[in-house]
Amino acid sequence: MEKMNWLSRLASRVPGHRVPQGASLQTPVMADPETCLMVFKNHWSQVVRILERQGPRAATGGADDLSAVRNHTYQMLTLLAEDRAVPSAPSGPGPLLEFALREDLLSRVLTWQLQWDEFGDGVEERRAEQLKLFEMLVSEARQPLLRHGPVREALLALLDACGRPVPSSPALDEGLVLLLSQLCVCVAREPSLLEFFLQPPPEPGAAPRLLLFSRLVPFVHREGTLGQQARDALLLLMALSDGSPTVGRYIADHSYFCPVLATGLSALYSSLPRKIEVPGDDWHCLRREDWIGVPALALFMSSLEFCNAVIQVAHPLVQKQLVDYIHNGFLVPVMGPALHKTSVEEMIASTAYLELFLRSISEPALLRTFLRFLLLHRHDTHTILDTLVARIGSNSRLCMVSLSLFRTLLNLSCEDVLLQLVLRYLVPCNHVMLSQKPAVRDVDLYGRAADKFLSLIPRCCRHHAPSPPRPEHASWARGPGSPSVDSSSVVTVPRPSTPSRLALFLRQQSLGGSESPGPVPRSPGLTASPTSSPSRRPSPAEEPGELEDNYLEYLREARRGVDRCVRACRTWSAPYDGERPPPEPNPLGSRTKKRSLLPEEDRDNVREGEEENLGSRGLAVGVGDTPGYLLPPQLNGVPGPWPEGAKKVRLVPRLVPQEGVRELLEGTSEDMAGLESFGQELQELEVALSNGGAGSEPPLEPPLPPEEEEAYESFTCPPEPPGPFLSSPLRTLHQLPSQPFTGPFMAVLFAKLENMLQNSVYVNFLLTGLVAQLACHPQPLLRSFLLNTNMVFQPSVKSLLQVLGSVKNKIESFAASQEDFPALLSKAKKYLIARGKLDWAEGPTAGPAPRRSDSLVRSRRPSLGELLLRHAHSPTRARQAVQVLQPGRDGTGLGLGGGSPGASTPVLLPRGGASERQGEALRVKNAVYCAVIFPEFLKELAAISQAHAVTSPFLLDTSEEVSLPPISGFGPLNP
């Protein structure tokens, strides 16, 4: 993840001593101190004769006087820069400096030169010369000049003169910023000097002045090295303000620093390209190499990086003010409308920008304000998060960018994000049958879930070669419910940042003459594949590495992912295990109430204090907080009632004591454990649903008022442009609002997952990666919802197992209708493997990459965005990859060539126009790719379910934590 490390780079940009630029200074010939002092006094005596005249133009040769003073001053300051303290008094000033302080040399010369500004001739040139001389003196001096008051007063007088209305020029701006930068470096070495530059108010009631700071602020958003120097200098002052309450209060209360930063971000964002030139079909996020060449975006990222660094080091008053200004001056008025543009290209660009910002920010306070904006800010009655969730069901490009954004959000491991997306709908436990609630916390110790997932691999996607006799090993694989997998081991070096489902395409296979991999450690009991059999090794023209025996790699990758989530979630406020936070007790059976028990006035209070509650425990209000409820944000501004997942779950006011509820639940689970009770409950539910939810018993709630029905309709079908957005509703068709609902996020993910055959290969990679990312979380509610294949859900709740089963049936149906499906599948695997190997290649070099150690290869392997989800920029690489599997340019068919460009197996397509043939070719290509990805996704889910069984948040090895990359997780968002 790209993180901002401004401070680590700052030292290299601010050296201790600098060679002055452009002054044409000659290295003085050092003489003895007495001679230097004599020469210094001689120059000063000649200057004094000119200064003691009545005015700048009293003599006829006024211009000559100005030139003479400039030359003598240059000689004196050159000598003064080389002056050193005498050995007898090492802490005192040197002889030249002592003489200059006694005569107040700097102030007298500067005052005389500033008198020439009244005539308006050559002011810019003189000011630039003055700045250059003082900068040379400050940077080259061998004594701490700033400790002496006369030197500081002269510098402040010069900085004050720079605030007068003088025509600006590049030389003048460069000289001013350079001098200020050198002063900041000196002050950073001696922080006690900072408050000496803070001038008292010129008159009662006025604000104090810190010219060292205020003169830098106008350059904070400047381009090029000038702006970079100004930001570096300001950052040094920000770091010093943390230890100086006086300076911190000045910056927060008497300067425009924070408003300038926030409004500058808004102005810079308005100059960003509204349409991103997409480099390829697999593009889904902005990497550094994408935006570094765009000047407007590079300048914005530099300013955002600076804001991140300021919040990291500045005084708490400055931090809070800057965060508030960014939220209210940039996110709400600029990012909010930008994310809701009507043009699809603009929506793609704004979503990609937002994902880049979230991925680049490293300071928690700034990250929190971005998340607060996403979770709580409403635009046209919808939260930003609701809008982004809906876009997952849109066209391919907008869907990919949205999936990439949610991948970044989940990587933050923020409790409030997951609570808002999924957990608040699962906390009431209405998605499971009442008798199944105790099973939420069950751990699958025998691999039954893994066995179930692996059994969903379509038969047409399995390797059917005969296997050698299975060795008799005493291992877990021989136990009941253990997975048995046809597989063939493939060598790779696992990498935590690479999703394991991509390991299929990133192996070093025996393609194109590459060396054969060594044996891979095999778990006892896993079926040996024909590929690893000594009696038979397939040729490269056969199955590409067989890709069947990579389950051990998935297990390693899953263990890393689960451990990472466990460590990142340790600071969360609740384990979300079905008891904490406690679901609302319901004495009426499995048909729970769908309305909040809050009175209307309490709902209004909750709505008013919604954003403030985010500071204490995010969206989850603790027991000690006033309302005492788990507060999901309102939907479309309507406080309720909503589906069960969106209702408010009581934490403090309870109908039954907590101990009684636990006994009631335990007793209920025991009474309902029998098959009769369970079957009777299912029958009752079936009868109730067949009658439209109405039975002989009175309804549990009155019907929704018309205005609330309208609000609910507006939520389920948001008033956005229909084309690029929802291809499937957030709720299934004919689903009643009173039925259990697992949330729009899971609904749109499952709907997209169910249409895997229609998705592009890149959408499926991002989609399956997002689901696997969710499955790695250790919260029992989420883990059981996704991975517990024995859990019985409510009839209206679709499980992941059902979705995967539907995809399996579609793949098998497609394979049965496609005569050459095995050949298509083999070609698709070869293409994806070749694509992965090309993206791992060493950049633009034409020759083969030299062999290197595994550790070096592991250290440079790119991330997800740089692997398969990455366009092959090099024409050579693109040509190599396109030979394997690409749709025909003329629309005549789907080219499925093997290794040579001319060898292809055309797919027989129906007669019709070119557009119909191209559409059919695209449909076949997407379905074949899906048949490759789907089995690997099932292996990944199976491995994750087994990793959960052996991972405990209390038993993690600390040594393992040290060896793995650091994880930054967020609990509830704090102010």
From Swiss-Prot:
One of its GO terms (biological process) is endosome to lysosome transport. The modification Phosphoserine is found at residues 467, 510, 523, 529, 533, 863, 900. It comes from the Eukaryota. Signal peptide: none annotated. Residues 465-496, 511-548, 573-621, 690-717 are annotated as: Disordered. GO terms for cellular component: FHF complex. InterPro entries: FHIP, FHIP_C, FHIP_KELAA_motif. Component of the FTS/Hook/FHIP complex (FHF complex), composed of AKTIP/FTS, FHIP1B, and one or more members of the Hook family of proteins HOOK1, HOOK2, and HOOK3. The FHF complex associates with the homotypic vesicular sorting complex (the HOPS complex). Belongs to the FHIP family. This is FHF complex subunit HOOK-interacting protein 1B.
